[in-house]
UniProtKB/Swiss-Prot annotation:
The gene is WRKY17. It comes from Arabidopsis thaliana. Transcription factor. Interacts specifically with the W box (5'-(T)TGAC[CT]-3'), a frequently occurring elicitor-responsive cis-acting element. It is found in: Nucleus. This is Probable WRKY transcription factor 17. The lineage of its organism: Eukaryota, Viridiplantae, Streptophyta, Embryophyta, Tracheophyta. Gene3D superfamilies: WRKY domain (2.20.25.80).
Length: 321
């Protein structure tokens, strides 16, 4: 679609422009004649003539800006000849270039001006120029020239490196292709196994999916010692439990399916930090009997040893000679 712009000025606008321009030119000539005379012969005020001249030229400018409004007309649409078969697209692939392997250790010193490396051209990697400061990255070595700064190089929008040192990158290792023809997803974490617990019986030996340095082997569940006894209930109250040689503190309860009496959970409060637990519930066959299940072992000897050692250590005074 073409658009033709046509300027059609009106006749009256052209006449007004010509009149204003002629008056402005005449007043400007008169002002020049007045200014060309000698100062003692000047009897006319030049400010009025100047204002009149400027006003006429301003009028000309306003008329020129106002005249000549554009009109748009839609031109004929030139449709290309339709063809049933599209033209064949010719695809050209660049010839493979031989990539030269970098030396294990290389220090290149250059005093000349550095050149620009364009990453879009495949033939740049095969040639090395002596006038550029080279930064090489290889699997076996990593060398940077002493006069170059890798961080100061600016990468332009087309992929070229300018105002810095040229870079020669080692070829990347081949990405393994799966049976479906697509490379594996890079977002999957590297699954590794903890070498400390590889042959340990205390761990399940399953591999972990996270890549941080902590061990994520699943610990096997310890078999706690459980002992169940049936004792007669002291009273009908749930909080009343038969006493034994230890003191217990209730820390929760849980309803039992099919029983109106909940199960109470207790932990040993004889010594702080004792891992022994027990839970008490009513027997389903006989409501006058209680089923007490003990879990864990009492560790009161270690707690008493710590209580005796702690005040003795705190009472020591270290003096300097």
């Amino acid at each position: 679609m073409t658009v033709d712009i046509m300027r059609l000025p009106k006749m009256e606008d052209q006449t007004a422009i010509q009149e204003a321009a002629s008056q402005g030119l005449k007043s400007m000539e008169h002002l020049i004649r007045v200014l060309s005379n000698r100062p003692e012969e000047r009897n006319v005020d030049c400010s009025e003539i100047t204002d009149f001249t400027v006003s006429k030229f301003k009028k000309v400018i306003s008329l020129l800006n106002r005249s000549g409004h554009a009109r748009f007309r839609r031109g004929p649409v030139h449709s290309p000849p339709s063809s049933s078969v599209p033209p064949p697209v010719k695809v050209t692939t660049p010839a493979p270039t031989q990539i030269s392997a970098p030396a294990p250790v290389s220090f290149v010193q250059a005093n000349q001006q550095s050149v620009t490396l364009d990453f879009t051209r495949p033939s740049v990697f095969g040639a090395k120029t002596k006038s550029s400061e080279v930064v090489e990255f290889a699997k076996e070595s990593f060398s940077v020239s002493s006069n170059s700064s890798f961080m100061s190089s600016a990468i332009t929008g087309d992929g070229s490196v300018s105002k810095g040192s040229s870079i020669f990158l080692a070829p990347a290792p081949a990405v393994p292709v799966t049976s479906s023809g697509k490379p594996p997803l890079s977002g999957l974490p590297y699954r590794k196994r903890c070498f400390e617990h590889d042959h340990s019986e205390g761990f399940s030996g399953k591999i972990s999916g996270s890549g941080n340095g902590k061990c994520h082997c699943k610990k096997s569940r310890k078999n706690r010692m459980k002992r169940t006894v049936r004792v007669p209930a002291v009273s009908a109250k749930i909080a009343d439990i038969p006493p034994d040689e230890y003191s217990w503190r209730k820390y929760g309860q849980k309803p039992i399916k099919g029983s109106p009496h909940p199960r109470g959970y207790y932990k040993c409060s004889t010594f702080r930090g004792c891992p022994a637990r027990k839970h008490v519930e009513r027997a389903l066959d006989d409501s006058t009997m209680l089923i007490v299940t003990y879990e864990g072992e009492h560790r009161h000897h270690q707690s008493t040893m710590q209580e005796h050692v702690t005040p003795s250590v705190s009472g020591l005074v270290f003096g300097s000679a």
